[in-house]
UniProtKB/Swiss-Prot annotation:
The active site is at residue 56. The lineage of its organism: Bacteria, Bacillati, Mycoplasmatota, Mycoplasmoidales, Mycoplasmoidaceae. The gene is cdd. This is Cytidine deaminase. This enzyme scavenges exogenous and endogenous cytidine and 2'-deoxycytidine for UMP synthesis. Homodimer.
């Protein structure tokens, strides 16, 4: 499957505005493609910080709720120009759970620059079910 990264970035730039970030204003949006279907998620902060939901896990929940189990592509959009943005450890483990060897992950900054990773580059020697 060929992806239109320009279109995906435009979608994520619209979706990221829905993030609920009253504490950090660090907005993140995620788009997952699984079996040619798209699933979106945004980060949702909570005053009880451990209850906060990351955009990646939000998108995974949408995908699983729709009956899908294997991620083909992950696009994570950050509202900063940090150049070193990437999923947190908890999200990396969640992404690994539903990824396969060919899963591709893109980390995109708000200037549309991006870095591409494989799941193994993102979480080397991650814990996997047998």
């Amino acid at each position: 499957m060929k992806v239109n990264l320009e279109w995906i970035i435009k979608q994520l730039q619209m979706i990221v505005k829905r993030a609920y970030t009253p504490f950090s204003n660090f907005k993140v949006a995620c788009m997952i493609i699984a079996n040619n279907q798209t699933f979106f998620g945004v980060n949702i902060e909570n005053s009880s910080f451990p209850v906060t939901l990351c955009a990646e896990r939000s998108a995974i929940a949408s995908m699983v709720t729709s009956g899908h189990r294997k991620i083909d592509y992950v696009f994570v959009y950050f509202n900063t120009k940090n150049k070193s943005n990437s999923p947190c450890g908890m999200c990396r483990q969640n992404l690994l759970e539903f990824s396969h060897q060919k899963t591709k992950l893109f980390c995109i900054d708000n200037d549309s620059s991006y870095k591409q990773f494989s799941i193994d580059e993102l979480l080397m020697n991650g814990f996997k079910k047998s």
